[in-house]
């Protein structure tokens, strides 16, 4: 059976010769167990995804360990990158490595030698990534070599291909880009007119839109007085600020070409920032660590906000659609100071929701929000039935009480600072048990998180925060995927898409 292309933009190809389904945008084969999440990554939602999955289930897809690899004389497989690697020439050994560094490791571990003559160059491919990577040698034609995109310089002093260290789809993190170690491949920041224009934009515009990690006030003073002086001493940190400025410009481009250029520069600045941060994270002082952590979290949010499709220029080496709800939660929570959980106060705190007086709310919007949160436990009980664990009920009530109080902060003004602070600090005030329930996809806890997204994340976007553009809908769609399906739709209706004020 010849390979067959299908799906939106014809991104999927089934190759019956090997029993694999290749994604042409991500450039690797998809495991059966990761099919649903992979299609969602490409923003293929429920109806279209179910139709695609039904069709793919009719195909004979093999598990990675069962796929027979092509012989070395075979031409490259269409849709997979060709890597300039090495083949071990030791007697009885034909091990393949993507870099000379890894080949030397193979010699030490398998042959007890360090002889660079025991290898020859080879063109390699792999169907899968992460823990299921299995290289095979191919023989490109002249035409293939002209079009070939080598993903590594294969020099011991330069960045090695790092497909082995990327997690597969089941691991939750996957990247179609190549991770490099620090070296000449990382772009440098030259002090030219373009760089100066990005810095000027950060000082005059971007800094005014960013949250402050220390309090709910405007972040402009924090970024100008605390972040910029440190960035002037650390080039990699300055790259983080320039990346945020480029992202901000990409969010509001003058035209499509300008938008793509800003995305490209954002990705380059981000790479140098992350390279420097990885090198110095363990030795940085507390102040520098706070600024760098905040930049990293905000760049991840910007990456999600700007990723219109998986093939976009990537600002961060991860999917444009967050693979897991937990990655969104941890990113948002990390933008504000951590707070020690008060587990002993859970019961007392939970009763606050029962004592709410909506007449004391600051305005009609907050009164409506408190009414809805107050009524939510009863609606969940009607839908999910009598709870088995009374302690978990108290945990949910405590989380709702904290949400009501954080909404008071978020809706106190039309400014981004209070809106972000209320949105992010909620996660520092909920019990640890609540976070455990969310991680286990406990339906009632997901309904509570859905209200956080519809109310507080949506509120932050409405206040003008470009960093969370579309994030509320992404969270709600992620949650909807995890909720049990029922005939009358009661569970889905609990994900209150319409309660945002």
Swiss-Prot record:
Residues 172-183 have a biased composition (Polar residues). GO terms for molecular function: DNA-binding transcription factor activity, RNA polymerase II-specific. One of its GO terms (biological process) is regulation of transcription by RNA polymerase II. It comes from the Eukaryota. Pfam families: OrsD. Induction: Expression is induced by an intimate physical interaction of the fungal mycelia with the bacterium Streptomyces hygroscopicus. Expression is repressed by VeA and MvlA via histone 3 acetylation by the SAGA/ADA complex. Residues 137-189 are annotated as: Disordered. Residues 142-169 have a biased composition (Acidic residues). SMART domains: ZnF_C2H2. Part of the gene cluster that mediates the biosynthesis of orsellinic acid, as well as of the cathepsin K inhibitors F9775 A and F9775 B. The non-reducing polyketide synthase orsA produces orsellinic acid by condensing acetyl-CoA with 3 malonyl-CoA units. Further modifications by the decarboxylase orsB and the tyrosinase-like protein orsC lead to the production of F9775 A and F9775 B. The functions of orsD and orsE remain unclear since only orsB and orsC are required to convert orsellinic acid into F9775 A and F9775 B. This is Orsellinic acid/F9775 biosynthesis cluster protein D. It comes from Emericella nidulans (strain FGSC A4 / ATCC 38163 / CBS 112.46 / NRRL 194 / M139) (Aspergillus nidulans). The lineage of its organism: Eukaryota, Fungi, Dikarya, Ascomycota, Pezizomycotina.
């Amino acid at each position: 059976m010849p390979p067959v292309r299908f799906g939106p933009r014809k991104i999927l190809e089934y190759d019956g010769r090997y029993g694999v389904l290749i994604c042409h945008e991500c450039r690797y084969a998809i495991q059966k167990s990761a099919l649903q999440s992979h299609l969602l990554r490409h923003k293929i939602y429920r109806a279209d995804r179910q139709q695609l999955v039904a069709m793919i289930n009719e195909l004979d897809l093999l598990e990675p360990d069962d796929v027979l690899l092509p012989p070395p004389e075979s031409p490259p497989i269409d849709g997979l990158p060709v890597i300039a690697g090495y083949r071990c020439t030791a007697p009885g050994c034909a091990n393949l490595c993507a870099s000379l560094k890894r080949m030397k490791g193979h010699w030490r571990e398998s042959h007890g030698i360090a002889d660079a003559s025991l290898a020859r160059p080879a063109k390699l491919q792999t169907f899968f990534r992460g823990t299921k990577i299995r290289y095979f040698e191919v023989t490109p034609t002249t035409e293939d070599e002209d079009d070939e995109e080598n993903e590594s310089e294969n020099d011991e002093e330069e960045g090695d291909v790092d497909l082995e260290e990327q997690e597969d789809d089941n691991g939750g993190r996957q990247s179609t880009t190549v991770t490099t170690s620090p070296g000449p491949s990382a772009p440098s920041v030259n002090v030219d007119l373009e760089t100066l224009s990005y810095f000027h934009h950060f000082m005059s515009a971007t800094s005014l839109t960013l949250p402050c990690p220390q309090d709910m006030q405007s972040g402009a003073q924090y970024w100008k007085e605390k972040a910029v002086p440190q960035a002037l001493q650390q080039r990699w940190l300055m790259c983080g600020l320039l990346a945020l400025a480029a992202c901000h410009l990409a969010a509001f481009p003058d035209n499509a070409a300008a938008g793509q250029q800003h995305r490209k520069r954002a990705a380059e600045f981000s790479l140098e920032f992350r390279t420097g941060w990885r090198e110095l994270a363990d030795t940085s002082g507390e102040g520098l660590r706070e600024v760098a952590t905040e930049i990293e979290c905000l760049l991840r949010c910007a990456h999600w906000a700007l990723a219109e499709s998986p093939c976009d220029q990537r600002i961060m080496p991860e999917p444009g659609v967050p693979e897991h709800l937990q990655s969104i939660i941890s990113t948002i929570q990390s933008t504000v100071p951590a707070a020690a959980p008060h587990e002993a106060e859970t019961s007392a705190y939970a009763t606050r929701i029962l004592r709410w007086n909506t007449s004391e709310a600051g305005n009609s919007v907050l009164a409506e929000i408190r009414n809805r949160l107050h009524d939510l436990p009863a609606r969940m009980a009607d839908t999910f039935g009598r709870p088995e664990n009374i302690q978990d009920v108290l945990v949910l009530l405590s989380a709702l009480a904290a949400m009501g109080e954080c909404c008071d902060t978020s809706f106190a003004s039309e400014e981004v600072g209070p809106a972000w602070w209320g949105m992010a600090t909620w996660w520092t005030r909920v019990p640890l048990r609540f976070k455990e329930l969310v991680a286990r996809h406990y339906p009632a806890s997901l309904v509570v998180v859905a209200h956080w997204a519809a109310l507080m994340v949506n509120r932050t976007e409405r206040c003008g925060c470009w960093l969370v553009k579309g994030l509320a809908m992404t969270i709600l769609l992620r949650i909807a995927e995890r909720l049990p399906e029922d005939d009358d739709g009661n569970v889905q209706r609990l994900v209150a898409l319409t309660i945002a004020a």
